[in-house]
Swiss-Prot record:
Necessary for sperm flagellar function. Plays a role in motile ciliogenesis. May help to recruit STK36 to the cilium or apical surface of the cell to initiate subsequent steps of construction of the central pair apparatus of motile cilia. Residues 152-267 form a coiled coil. Isoform 1 is detected in testis. Isoform 4 is detected in testis and brain, and at lower levels in kidney, heart, pancreas, thyroid, ovary, adrenal gland, spinal cord, trachea and liver. InterPro entries: G-protein_beta_WD-40_rep, WD-F-box_domain-protein, WD40/YVTN_repeat-like_dom_sf, WD40_repeat_CS, WD40_repeat_dom_sf, WD40_rpt. It comes from Homo sapiens. WD repeats lie at residues 350-389, 392-431, 434-473, 476-515, 518-557, 560-600, 601-630. Phosphorylated by TSSK2. This is Sperm-associated antigen 16 protein. Residues 277-287, 295-304 have a biased composition (Basic and acidic residues). Residues 266-332 are annotated as: Disordered. It is found in: Cytoplasm; Cytoplasm, Cytoskeleton, Flagellum axoneme; Cytoplasm, Cytoskeleton, Cilium axoneme; Cell projection, Cilium, Flagellum. GO terms for biological process: axoneme assembly; cerebrospinal fluid circulation; cilium assembly; mucociliary clearance; sperm axoneme assembly.
Length: 631
């Protein structure tokens, strides 16, 4: 009897308690056998060996047909091999396909006690136990065998411990899985809340966009009648333009016919003899044209009568043809070189607020300055002594322009009005009201009967001085119209706008004839050269462009930025272009050589610049309320 390894003290105490209470058989025999096999215990078994008799051995008979030795191989080794193979085949055939079930025999009580005593080293107790145990067996007391099997407590404990460990591992895994699931749940809840909030925000934005869309639809619907009226007006104006062009062609033909008739009449008066023949020949030649000319004359008279009855009898008439431009007689290249060596000569503080405009009287050495202090002043040159001060506007002045005769002055203001002043008396003789926002610029027509103005309300207006009303409103710009000017001695207008375009208009019809594109920023000013061949414009980033007015194409672009160009002006020869810049510098551009000269003298922004009639003196106004003279 022997034991493989020792037992723990706790197991011994459990065993002693079980023996003291009387052991009873319990547990499943198969589970106990598995536990004992896992423990590796040894068993004590009594075996009686009897001597076997060879006479009682039963030999297996092998049939001759199943055991035969081939010819030529009748030796002992072959015979033994054949016999073994035959026996193996028979055993395989007789073997059952179903494996026998495993039967575990539990450890008997006496073997268990003996193993326990040996492990504990209790040899004397073991001797006493064995003596008494075998003595009882010899006496025939066999009731002890019927007690039954004692369950293997140690094996059960080990199994329970293993199961407990496995359960703890499973519990740990489940806790980890639960923690991970909790984290995932929190993350999913946060994402759910985020997406819910995002969804609510999107729903609110969608509802807002829907409301805005509805408002825009209503807004656009309110514009449809206006657009329809404008389209009708546009078509009407186009028809009127076509009729006007046809009538103009007819009038030109009539004038040419009259001129030829006058020439023939003059020839007839100079030669009295053949006067009758000439008259008869003229009558024969003009016989087909006579009724036509007569009909045209009658139609014109009827149209004039209808116009007088239908319109305002005080309305002025635009000149039919372009008037001769006296500046065209000036030589293209002046014999004297252009002047660029201007130096600051005098500084006159005339206004308390920035100077917005200075302008020269057309025929005399008189200068007018306008300021944001709501005043305009007439200055006598060259000392710039104040001759007259005018006031009447309720807001800052933006621009001024002399009547072609020089006896009247037009001023534009931030109070949305244009006023006409009598320079002899210094009184306001007329006020034009119609713009909805500040008026930026004004200009006189060469005939002196019309004043044009441009405004922050994206429109320009043409005012009739005689009828004292607005004759036409020019629509087309999409932003503030910053400047306006009449082409010299014609009915053509030039406007510059914050929508980065220049527009050319027919003042008689109010139709935009052409738009010029090229500036990338708001255009602050645009002006014709004295001969009317070029246009100069400057924008809010200091870029100055020259345009060919005859071809309506850009000539050159000059970047003098980044300070804005506030105003541009030509000298009387048209060779020098001056630009007043936002950094206080006056730039002089030589149009012949392309050189740029700078005049430094303004401490702050330079708002306006103008040349004297002879080009020897330059006047500039700045944001400090001063007018400076350069010579």
């Amino acid at each position: 009897m022997a034991a493989q390894r020792g037992m723990p003290s706790s197991a011994v105490r459990v065993l002693e308690e079980a023996l003291g209470m009387g052991l009873t058989a319990a547990g499943d025999a198969r589970d106990t056998a598995d536990a004992v096999a896992a423990e590796g215990a040894y068993y004590l078994e009594q075996v009686t060996i009897t001597e076997a008799s060879e006479d009682d051995y039963e030999y297996e008979e092998i049939p001759d047909d199943n055991f035969s030795i081939p010819e030529g191989e009748e030796d002992l080794a072959k015979a033994i091999q054949m016999a073994q193979e035959q026996a193996t085949d028979t055993e395989i055939l007789e073997r059952k396909t179903v494996l026998p079930s495993k039967h575990a025999v539990p450890e008997v009580i006496e073997d268990f006690l003996c193993n326990f005593l040996i492990k504990m080293g209790m040899t004397r107790t073991l001797d006493c136990f064995q003596s008494e145990w075998y003595e009882l067996i010899q006496k025939g007391v066999t009731e002890l065998r019927t007690v039954g099997n004692v369950p293997d407590v140690y094996t059960q404990i080990m199994l329970l411990e293993n199961e407990n460990k496995n359960l703890k591992k499973d519990l740990k895994h489940y806790k980890q899985a639960a923690d991970k699931a909790r984290e995932d749940l929190l993350k999913i809840q946060k994402e759910r809340d985020f997406h819910r909030m995002h969804h609510k925000r999107i729903v609110q934005e969608k509802n807002k966009l829907i409301n805005d869309l509805k408002g825009l639809k209503l807004h656009y619907a309110s514009y449809e009648p206006t657009i329809r009226v404008l389209h009708e007006k546009h078509h009407t104006l186009l028809k009127e333009k076509m009729l006007t062009s046809l009538e103009r062609d007819k009038v030109v033909g009539q004038i040419s016919g009259l001129q030829e008739t006058l020439k023939k009449l003059q020839r007839g008066h100079s030669y009295h003899g053949p006067q009758i023949k000439v008259d008869h020949s003229r009558e024969k030649e003009n016989a087909p044209e006579g009724p036509t000319q007569k009909g045209l004359r009658e139609a014109r008279e009827q149209n004039k009568c209808k116009t007088k009855m239908k319109g305002n009898t005080k309305d002025s008439e635009f000149p039919i043809d372009m008037q001769p431009n006296p500046n065209l007689n000036v030589s293209k290249e002046s014999l004297s070189p252009a002047k660029f060596d201007y130096k600051l000569k005098n500084i006159f503080r005339l206004h308390e607020l920035p100077v917005s405009c200075v302008s020269m009287q057309p025929h005399k050495d008189i200068l007018v300055s306008c300021g944001e202090d709501r005043l305009w002043k007439v200055l006598g040159l060259p000392k710039c002594n104040v001759l007259l001060t005018g006031f009447g506007h309720t807001d800052w002045l933006s621009d001024c322009c002399f009547h072609p005769s020089g006896d009247k002055l037009a001023t534009s203001s931030g109070d949305t009005t244009v006023k006409l002043w009598d320079l002899c008396k210094g009184d306001c003789i007329l006020t034009f009201e119609g713009h909805s926002r500040a008026v930026w610029s004004c200009t006189w027509h060469s005939c002196g009967n019309f004043v044009a103005s441009s405004s922050l309300d994206k429109t320009s207006k043409i005012w009739d001085v005689n009828s004292e009303r607005c004759r036409c409103t020019l629509y087309g710009h999409t932003d503030s119209v910053n400047s306006i000017e009449f082409f010299p001695f014609s009915n053509t207008l030039l406007t510059s706008s914050a929508d980065k375009t220049l527009s050319i208009w027919d003042a008689r019809t109010g139709i935009c004839e052409q738009s010029l594109y090229g500036h990338m920023h708001s255009i602050n000013d645009a002006i014709f050269d004295p001969r009317g061949h070029m246009i100069a414009s400057c924008d809010a980033c200091g870029v100055t462009k020259l345009w060919d007015f005859r071809k309506l194409l850009p000539i050159v672009s000059i970047d003098i930025g980044p300070s804005p160009g506030n105003e541009v002006n030509f000298d009387s020869s048209g060779r020098v272009l001056a630009q007043a810049s936002g950094n206080g510098v006056i730039h002089l551009l030589d149009l012949k050589s392309g050189e740029i000269h700078k005049l430094m003298g303004h401490e702050n922004e330079a708002h306006t610049v103008v040349f004297s009639h002879d080009g020897e003196i330059l006047f500039s106004g700045g944001s400090d309320g001063t007018v400076r003279t350069w010579s």
